[in-house]
Amino acid sequence: GLWKTLKDSAKSAVTNVAVTMLDKLRCKLTGGC
């Protein structure tokens, strides 16, 4: 239903943000930017 769709899209948005932030952090830590 609609609720599941909303939850799924929210979850994937949060995942995308987390992955992006982790990439930036790893970039800074390793100096591989």
Curated annotation (Swiss-Prot):
Any Gene Ontology CC annotation: extracellular region
GO biological process, alphabetically ordered: defense response
Compartments, as annotated in UniProt: Secreted
Matching Pfam families: Antimicrobial_2 (PF08023)
Entry keyword set: Antimicrobial, Disulfide bond, Secreted
Keyword Secreted belongs to the record: yes
Disulphide bond pairs: C27-C33
Main location per the UniProt record: secreted
Top-level taxon of the source organism: Eukaryota
InterPro entries linked to this entry: Antimicrobial_frog_2
Tissues expressing this chain: Expressed by the skin glands.
Function: Antimicrobial peptide.
Family according to the record: Belongs to the frog skin active peptide (FSAP) family. Brevinin subfamily.
Name of the protein in question: Brevinin-2Rk
Record organism: Pelophylax ridibundus
